[in-house]
């Protein structure tokens, strides 16, 4: 599945709150599957499904908080440097400024969802 979705439709259809959009009017989604980037945030990129919508749940956010700030910066820089379509953060876990700045730097749309991780995952997969 490869499709282009208007950002506005994506936001409205999934009831997302945009944190950073950049100039993008569309998202190129290559799969209805999602990627939970725990392995990538730990530094493993060998089998990274970068063409999927990326979903940060409580585990990913808490893991990032546990890292030394310099290590966290390096991991975020590496992760966001890949051509990922967008990142959704579940459970209204508003990201810290470091995540927002790196998303801006690499022009990766960043969204917030009030839903728990499983619910937003299911909605994205059928969207």
Predicted regions and their residues:
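Feature captures the catalytic cores and cofactor-binding loops of soluble hydro-lyases/lyases
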Residues: 44-55, 59-127
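Gly/Thr-rich phosphate-binding loop signature of adenosyl cofactor/nucleotide-binding cores
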Residues: 1-79
